[in-house]
């Protein structure tokens, strides 16, 4: 199943230190927010620019007839950067409560943009939904960084050298990192190949791995069959879920981690056993190399610890937004 992965072989740690991350051949760097700054007079834009608290009361307004819940400041519905109301379905009442809690917990002191991770992601989900409606103003699509097709093509590039497809050399960390990667990654890779077959007419879905002991320092690229299956999977997602996939992939540098998060927040009764996991294991999979670096060299204060908390926060935020009640 993994013809290029032989026992006892393991990607050079130094490869990933010298190169930020392997991407598909000739690809431009990813991982940045492509949303164009805009001056739409909304609460989220105002907070982003002033970093100051300007409200007294946070509340939820339930519209029973429409089955919607609006997040409000002083009786006015909070709007996204593109001017859409932060309104969710009644089925997402837990999400609405957590959004309210996020705003209620803010202090009166200077507010940092990362203080509202859940609101930021939900706003992205809502704006992506609205910009994918037929007849949407092209300028709004440009402000959010492109439509769903643009996002899908960007995310596909992460599959070429996915974090979970990059294997370290056997001589690093006395082979312990490679053994941990074999134990954690290989079952997930097999499960992912089986999962992608559901979105392809081809049965020979094989993910190309990047093994330092075999391939050395080079790029990596998935087959068209794999890419087409992955793109078909993304096409099956709602704009809301696509935004969550995007957030997870950008956080973990792993398309596979994005799929794991989304699929484990649905009904998992029919999910392939190898793909069943929890959020902490997704965080571990995405940061396995860093874990071993810290164990050997120690933690760099205000770097490793901050990065670890940041990744955990983003993964759990995405999980909350993806949760299906």
From Swiss-Prot:
Exists either as a homo- or heterooligomer. InterPro entries: ATP12_ATP_synth-F1-assembly (IPR011419), ATP12_ATP_synth-F1-assembly_N (IPR042272), ATP12_ortho_dom_sf (IPR023335). The keyword Zinc does not apply. Essential for the assembly of the mitochondrial F1-F0 complex. This is Protein ATP12, mitochondrial. One of its GO terms (cellular component) is mitochondrion. One of its GO terms (biological process) is mitochondrial proton-transporting ATP synthase complex assembly. The lineage of its organism: Eukaryota, Fungi, Dikarya, Ascomycota, Saccharomycotina. Keywords: Chaperone, Mitochondrion, Transit peptide. It is found in: Mitochondrion; Mitochondrion intermembrane space. Pfam families: ATP12. Residues 1-32 form a transit peptide. Belongs to the ATP12 family. Present with 6370 molecules/cell in log phase SD medium. One of its GO terms (molecular function) is protein domain specific binding.
